[in-house]
Amino acid sequence: VICYVGYNNPQTCPPGGNVCFTKTWCDARCHQLGKRVEMGCATTCPKVNRGVDIKCCSTDKCNPFPKTTPPWKRPRGKP
């Protein structure tokens, strides 16, 4: 299986790695930079922890970098 391991960076998974994943979560700078993203290969879908979103799939290049609209942008000026 070929999985993305970074932005526009696909790599062939090692033997046994037949699941691609994209994991996103907020850290202390989420409001400035957006969610953190980790991508890669695994033998099974990683365990979901509180506050972490994980998407798993098992076909080539099925885990592209998430398209985000920055919710951290604040409107300028007064309404």
From Swiss-Prot:
The organism's place on the tree of life at top rank: Eukaryota
GO molecular function, one term: toxin activity
Record localization: Secreted
SUPFAM superfamilies tied to this protein: Snake toxin-like
UniProt-listed Pfam families: Toxin_cobra-type
Gene3D superfamilies: CD59 (2.10.60.10)
Main location class: secreted
Expression by tissue: Expressed by the venom gland.
GO cellular component: extracellular region
Disulfide-bonded cysteines: C3-C20, C13-C41, C26-C30, C45-C56, C57-C62
Protein purpose: Binds with high affinity to muscular (alpha-1/CHRNA1) and neuronal (alpha-7/CHRNA7) nicotinic acetylcholine receptor (nAChR) and inhibits acetylcholine from binding to the receptor, thereby impairing neuromuscular and neuronal transmission. Produces paralysis, clear dyspnea and lethality on mice.
Remaining remarks: Exists in two forms which are separated by reverse-phase high-performance liquid chromatography, but which have the same sequence and molecular weight. The existence of cis and trans isomers may explain the two different elution peaks.
Family according to the record: Belongs to the three-finger toxin family. Long-chain subfamily. Type II alpha-neurotoxin sub-subfamily.
Record-given protein name: Alpha-elapitoxin-Aa2e
Organism: Acanthophis antarcticus (Common death adder)
